[in-house]
Curated annotation (Swiss-Prot):
Lipidation (GPI-anchor amidated alanine): 104
Lineage, opening ranks: Eukaryota, Metazoa, Chordata, Craniata, Vertebrata
GO MF entries: nucleic acid binding
Pfam families, per the entry: Shadoo
Gene that encodes the chain: SPRN
Family, per entry: Belongs to the SPRN family.
Official protein name in the record: Shadow of prion protein
Length: 117
């Protein structure tokens, strides 16, 4: 289950990276001049809204969240399969959960691969 959560975070990161809207308003585009009310007698004061964060910052935030989620899921998967004193099982009786998809880990989430080592 935790592996699926990590994969979902990775897919979310990839979607945020590659699906940035190319037609998004940038720079000085959009409605200006008369369409904003200058010709209708509006005051000449410029009202600035809150600063908007760019796509690069959103992608970086998504990358940090995906790396943290994947690292936590990997750590939890390891903790569940390792030998503990009180559970009465030998370390050879349980196969680690990350072996079955360990080949995909380095290219799906490089940060999780770094945390893996």
């Amino acid at each position: 289950m935790r592996q699926r959560v990590a994969c979902c975070w990775v897919l979310l990161l990839l979607a945020a990276t590659f699906c940035q809207p190319a037609a998004a308003k940038g720079g000085r585009g959009g409605s200006r001049g008369a369409a904003r009310g200058m010709a209708r007698g509006a005051a000449r004061s410029r009202h600035r809204g809150l600063p908007r964060y760019g796509g690069a910052l959103r992608v970086a935030a998504a990358a940090a969240a995906a790396g943290a989620a994947a690292g936590a899921a990997l750590h939890q998967a390891r903790a569940e399969t390792e030998y503990h004193e009180g559970n009465g099982t030998a370390w050879t009786s349980v196969a680690p959960g990350w072996v079955e998809w360990g080949w995909a880990m380095p290219w799906l989430c490089p940060l999780a691969a770094i945390l893996h080592h």
